[in-house]
Amino acid sequence: MPPFDVVVVGAGPAGSAAAGLLARHGRRVLILEKDRFPRRKVCGDFLSASAADALEVLGLRDEVSAEAEHIRRGALAVAGGPEIPFRLPEAALSLSRERLDARLASWAQSQGAQARFGALVRGLERSPEGFHVRFSEGPNESRVETRRVVAAWGRWDAMDRERAQHDRQARGRRFLGWSREFAPDEDGAFAGRVGLYLFPGGYCGLSRVEGGGVHFAGMVEDSTRKRLAPGWDAVLAHARESNRPLDRALSRLTPSTDFKGAGPVYLAAKPPTEDGALMVGDAAGVLDPFTGQGLACALASGILAATTLERGFSGALAWDDVPRAYAAAWKDRFRQRFGWSAAFRHLVTRPRIARAAARWAGGRLVRSAIRRLGTGGDAARVNS
């Protein structure tokens, strides 16, 4: 019998959610995380109402809500076009990934999961009883045996490159992401609101996080970045020149950190299983950040993986059917959202089309996007 029932590769929101729930059911769980916490991540730091529902399943909603900024309204500013105000049907939460990831990983350990930070997974090999997982901690390489693997290694891990999972995405549009922190806004202009800004070849957003600081994150097409001078300052200058509301907003803010970049990013769904491993979070596909649903889908997919695995452990589902059942359930819950995300991406990254749509549809377009992209109930469905 392997020493672990499940090895979870990655301690982000999806991995910690899966690990904590499985450990809560008495399963022997090991988390292998290459970074040491707390850590900065390129992310929108936005927890939609669906994400709050997932936190409720974990028993963390009240705890996170008490610390986070509550977002109830916002505005979408189209480059060279109108600025469209909107209200969210349910309050969202804004909390830095440093705080969120550390809190979730600590919670998973409190449920009984073991965790090793600074442990870089080098490879997975099938074995008669499950998997051999190779990982290194500094110069030392080790191997551990497990019955199942949950892959929560993010959008483009070395494991993805080894397993050639990005061949299909590499033929698509490449994006790069960034984030930066600003000191608290003294006039409270961003209290309870989010600003979304479109510019040629990309988009970005501003929102308050815990403590009153303002978080800035965005995406730009690699083809657009290559036409600009090197560095994130050139991307920001391009965005500000194209979008006056963004320029006005940033002129009132003072940076408190340097830019942090990430990429390449391929915005597409990937297979939800790979050789028996269950893919969760960005490892199963990167949802467009402008949807505000990335963290919600990450948490919900972690919950789904744990729920499906527990059915296998308990005998309610045949053990060999676990990957197939997870893949079918993942597609049922998330595939349509990826489709709508791609459709709206073609709109928001094309300035002429975006301007025309904003002038013609305005608030109706924003409300439709919120309805199509922000469908709630994922966590409740997964947990049923």
Language-model features, listed with the residues they occupy:
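A conserved beta-strand/loop capping segment in the N-terminal third of enzymes
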Residues: S50-A105
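Flavin (FAD/FMN) cofactor-binding core of flavoprotein oxidoreductases
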Residues: H70-L76, S251-A268, A325-D332
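FAD/FMN-dependent oxidoreductases across multiple families
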Residues: T224-T308
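C-terminal helical "tail/cap" subdomain of flavin- and related membrane-associated enzymes
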Residues: T307-S384
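Glycine-rich FAD pyrophosphate-binding loop
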Residues: A23-C43
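Beta1/beta-strand and adjacent pyrophosphate-binding region of the FAD-binding site
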Residues: M1-A14
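Predominantly flavin-linked oxidoreductase catalytic cores and closely associated redox partners
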Residues: W107-A249
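Conserved N-terminal glycine-rich FAD pyrophosphate-binding loop of Rossmann-like flavoproteins
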Residues: R36-E56
